[in-house]
Amino acid sequence: YIESHLRPQWGWRSIFGIIGFILIYILIAIDLEIDFSQLLKDSYLYMKDVIGRMLPPDFTNFKNLMLSMLETVEIAMMGTLLAILLSIPVGLFSARNIAPNYPVYLVAKTITVFFRAIPEFIMAMILVIAIGFGAMPGIIALGLHTMGFLAKFYAEAIEHVSEDPIQALESMGASKWQVISFAVVPQIIPSFIGNNLYILDRNIRMATMLGIVGAGGIGYELQSAFRMFQYPRVSAIIIVIFITIFVIDMISSWIRSKVV
């Protein structure tokens, strides 16, 4: 009885849904003219050739690589700080249960959707044209784009808090900010820390790419190596990026396990 109860019940809707899902992807593959057999064959040959050119890695001027990687991490950290500072008020106002009124909620929600919709890569290109090369375009691009994500995460966390502490404080005549400070904030702190660490980890990965458009960091070194066909240098840069992100991911996981 237990096994039959736990066994998934496949109705006609589920079956037709799965068939429809498969057909959609078959049609997409046909429309994009994807030949999987040729793709696998060509990918193997091309990857074998590229990997052969990239070995052994060229770690000359290792100090410059590490300084560029440090700049990338600094850009990501400053971009994350900017995102946190901007997303706190936007996240509060885009939460249905504590927004002052619907127009304020709608404006805040629109802001989060707008900045999520513009990739940081495109935003960095626009900012490089507007204010020039360097770290600042990367910081602003990461801050604005990830502000949209953080504000969304904050709002969702706020909307799922327990209503009992909120109602208790409101019944005692507490102000809106007192309710937020003493009933909402304590409940969302674990989510707040976890989301911030996730965004920092993500921003470090994205900051490596923003240098390609002139926003500073190791991405510029990567672009230069590709442009000069210095594939051993490219593999060295990729290794440095991988080790850095791996170490930071381990640190983030440790912090998350201790705090969240």
Regions found by a protein language model. Give the residues of each.
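N-terminal, non-cleaved signal-anchor transmembrane helix
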Residues: 1-81, 88, 93
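Generic alpha-helical transmembrane segments of integral inner-membrane proteins
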Residues: 21-23, 77, 81, 85, ...
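Alpha-helical membrane-interface segments at transmembrane helix boundaries
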Residues: 66-74, 108-115, 201, 223
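Cytoplasmic-entry segments and transmembrane alpha-helices of multi-pass inner-membrane transporters
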Residues: 90-124, 153
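Generic hydrophobic transmembrane alpha-helix motif, especially the helices
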Residues: 113-146
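Glycine-rich helix-loop "coupling/hinge" segments at transmembrane-helix boundaries
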Residues: 129, 206-241, 260
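Membrane-cytosol interface at the C-terminal ends of specific transmembrane alpha-helices
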Residues: 133-199, 250
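C-terminal transmembrane helix and the adjacent membrane-cytosol boundary/short C-terminal tail
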Residues: 194, 235-260
